[in-house]
Amino acid sequence: MDAQIEKAIEIAWDPRSDPNLKEQAVQYLTQVRGDTSSLQACLNLFTRAPKAAEVVRLVSLDIVNNAIQTQHIDDQSLRGLKEQLHDYVRRTYASGNEVDPPALQNKLTQTLTFLFSSLYKEGWESFIRDFLSFAGHQNGSVDNLSGVVLYLRLLSSIHDEIADLMIARAGEETKRNVELKDLVRARDVHTVAASFQQILTYWQGNNDAIVEMTLKVIGKWVSWIDISLVVNQDILNLLFPLVGRNPNGGEDKVKDAAIDCFTEIVAKKMKPSDKIGMILFLNLGEVVSQLISSPALHDLRNTSSYDTDLAEAVAKLVNNVVSDLVKILEDAKVEPDVRAQAEQLLQTFLPLLLRFFSDEYDEICATVIPSLTELNTFLRKAQPLPPAYSAMLTPILNAIIQKMRYDDTSSYADEDELTDEAEFQELRKRLQVLQKTIAAVDEALYVDVLSNVIGSTFQRLDEQNGQIDWRDLDLALHEMYLFGELTLVNGGLYAKSQPSSIAAERLIVMMSKMVESGIASFNHPAISLQYMEICVRYCSFFENQTQYIPQVLEQFVSFVHHSHSRVRIRSWYLFHRFVKHLRGQVGNVAETIIQSISDLLPLKAEVPRENDDDMSSDDGNHDAADVAFNAQLNLYEAIGCISSTTSTPIEKQAIYARTIMDPLFSDIERNLEQAKSGNAQATLQIHHIIFALGSLAHGFSDWSPGEGKRAGQAPVKEITIEFSRAAEAILFALEALKASFEVRNAARSSFSRLMGVMGVAMLPLLPRWIDGLLSQSSSKEEIAMFLRLLDQVVFGFKKDIHEVLNSLLTPLFQRVFASLSEPVTGTDDGIQLAELRREYLTFVTVILNNELGSVLVSEQNQAFFDPLIQSVTSLAKTVTNENGNLAASKIAFNVMTKMAEIWGGPTIATPGQPITSPVPSQPTFPGFDSFLIERFHPVCWEVLRDPNFRPLVDAQSKSVLNELAGLEQAIYMKTGNMFVEHLQGNFFPSMGVDGSGFIKSMVESPERKGLATFLQNWMKGKA
């Protein structure tokens, strides 16, 4: 059997093997893996001499490994494996002969670890001592390199298997691991601790790899053994020289491992008094101070030889110490003397923490952010703050502010440093959180420190005639941007034209100095961006200090022409934000602005090349063009804002709109014929123009249909006339190019924006918009989005839309029904179908809710009434939990309930109240009472009897059930005894169901919830 397995492994792992033969070999090995009788053969292949090929030995041992791990092996076989492997290790490792390659050592370690887990309790109690004995050529020595390596590997692997808290384990496994740790503590922990000392003593200076391995194992085991076994003078006498060795720098893995070992020792859970005692015993404050003062971390700090690995290791140690000290101080039960010691240690460690927090390398800074965050949180809670704690705030805040500054070596936004830039901005966000915490602890200090940093920088800028490091100015502006958040929390800069707070008062002074200082002309892209961002964020300053607006507008006109593309593109958006917010204060400046930025308005579409979608392509030109176009739309919207200010005469507003739009109309004419011929460049150009027209309209009026506060405001006639030309131009292009997704997308966006400037004048054009936007090429998603727009139109113009809606409903529903009936071709298509169903039903609901239901039953749309009802009832009955069916079902039941309420006539029965004198139903049109009973009511019971409908276990189904109950009660309220008699004499008998309970609940429950509860219980009893 040994030979068969060996041959199968060789064939399976030989790339030259015949595929059919290889498949047979793999199948055979799969059988071997599940057959415990083959384990002996596999173990023989691993241990035999002469040795088999490495892959044969590795696979064979893996099969054994798997059998032990999955416990598919009896105790007797386990003991046999133990004896054979023990003998193999003794022959191979204890003798110091040629050992196995690393991959085999790893697999052997894993197998032995699984044997430890299975037999250490009973069967191999001497496991640890046996492998320690292989570490020396003579009894009690540790001079056998291969034996020591295997012993340390096993100790590390045992920890990972039974004590690593980062690995989630099942309950039984956790229980087993607790027992094994207890057994190790009772039997072998003293032996293990002594072996650490022996190995470090013998191999220190002889083999750094062994010393490093030992330190890492100590760091692991210290978390679950008695701390005194490691923290004693003998071990420390060995550790301290390792921590302090090689002070002049250079990579030293042993030194880093020794510091990591201290870090793990400090991290061990223990009582506060014991933790303080250990930190003092280890004299960690002095140890860390000496490391910081060593040439490796001090003299070489600002050089390329700086030992970042060492710095990160020491930073991690400091982070753990400070974190533990904060936890002790947060514990209200800690004894006063222990608290006093913790406070003293915190005073010692804070400068050490801030040293690493201020490190030029952000990775090192990030290492101590967790403990600094914990400290700041503790200080925020410790109110009122004792003087000792208050004194900590200033150095912490100063360190945070300084860390916000760009490094002296950084070059802003160079192409090859964009990743570094993104990482730095992410660090700034983390630092901002820390800074906010300081503000929460002591706002007055925060205001003073930041005011000083910002004010002194502005003063230096003035004194040095603008000759200042851009990094310092960027820091001041960044802090100014953050500083203003205090004013936002307090309700803004001004209250009744006066500063709302001390912080607001300071920010107002800063804003004035910033605008007056000439910073806007400082020649650096970072400064230009910061300046604009601040102006936009604190626009309310300019509402009160209007004298600065012309100056800042002039600066923005300069920024929108900036030579740096990042500044230029961002400025287009910020310029729009600025003028939109201040449209009431900018005055009649449209003509000047339009003349100043007219050179930026021409649109130039760039068609993506075929390889732009290739993942391997690094050409970002198309993305850049797309970003630039989207930013350019902000210029059009900004012009719309400026042109429509209250101080600009209406005639002038119309002229400005015409001035901008006429070139766009001409551009459409130039490109339309080529676009109709399929020219992608021309089509995309028209797409851009349509978007630009919509953006200009949005600038003139950002009102959307349905906004109650402005719904009654009619657009000015002169402006409506101008933008009616825009609507005609867009429709002209859309009708010619409705097969183009890009053109439809642009037109749909502009449709909603033109509503704001055209109002009811858009309504007669709706049929043309629908014809263009809902073409045969339109996707379900497009139709759903347009229905969502129509919801707003119906709501916003419900008094004026009746006739238009009546005329467009049939063609609209034809397109919707056609799309609903199309087969689903994939997951995305299914999602779009679900969205279309919801939007279609919501649109019908909006019509009914806005007293426009008559259009659904008008003579013009009568032919579509029955298909409408069929679609609604069909969607109500579709309750499988996929493709959003349940959400659509809920809306469909709501639609039927609305129809019952609107067309069912007056209420003749009230649930919860007896019918004293029966009154016949009086539906809005004849026969609708019977329609409710014969068409709507059966839908409810089809759903209730559908096995896919499970309101007992599914929240969405339960929601559908509630709507269903509402429909049943609505039918009863409109038809009264007619419905009850139908249920008693016809419906329930034909089903063979006792419906008396249902009828009783429907008639007597004052709310639908009672009936829904009855139906839920009925379904529970049926289940």
From Swiss-Prot:
<dbReference type="Pfam" id="PF19282">
    <property type="entry name" value="Exportin-T"/>
</dbReference>
<dbReference type="GO" id="GO:0031267">
    <property type="term" value="F:small GTPase binding"/>
</dbReference>
<dbReference type="InterPro" id="IPR016024">
    <property type="entry name" value="ARM-type_fold"/>
</dbReference>
<dbReference type="GO" id="GO:0071528">
    <property type="term" value="P:tRNA re-export from nucleus"/>
</dbReference>
<dbReference type="GO" id="GO:0016363">
    <property type="term" value="C:nuclear matrix"/>
</dbReference>
<keyword id="KW-0539">Nucleus</keyword>
<protein>
    <recommendedName>
        <fullName>Exportin-T</fullName>
    </recommendedName>
</protein>
<dbReference type="InterPro" id="IPR013598">
    <property type="entry name" value="Exportin-1/Importin-b-like"/>
</dbReference>
<dbReference type="InterPro" id="IPR045546">
    <property type="entry name" value="Exportin-T_C"/>
</dbReference>
<comment type="function">
    <text>tRNA nucleus export receptor which facilitates tRNA translocation across the nuclear pore complex. Involved in pre-tRNA splicing, probably by affecting the interaction of pre-tRNA with splicing endonuclease.</text>
</comment>
<dbReference type="GO" id="GO:0005737">
    <property type="term" value="C:cytoplasm"/>
</dbReference>
<keyword id="KW-0820">tRNA-binding</keyword>
<dbReference type="Pfam" id="PF08389">
    <property type="entry name" value="Xpo1"/>
</dbReference>
<dbReference type="InterPro" id="IPR040017">
    <property type="entry name" value="XPOT"/>
</dbReference>
<dbReference type="GO" id="GO:0000049">
    <property type="term" value="F:tRNA binding"/>
</dbReference>
<keyword id="KW-0819">tRNA processing</keyword>
<keyword id="KW-0963">Cytoplasm</keyword>
<keyword id="KW-0813">Transport</keyword>
<dbReference type="GO" id="GO:0008033">
    <property type="term" value="P:tRNA processing"/>
</dbReference>
<dbReference type="GO" id="GO:0005643">
    <property type="term" value="C:nuclear pore"/>
</dbReference>
<dbReference type="InterPro" id="IPR011989">
    <property type="entry name" value="ARM-like"/>
</dbReference>
<comment type="similarity">
    <text>Belongs to the exportin family.</text>
</comment>
<keyword id="KW-0694">RNA-binding</keyword>
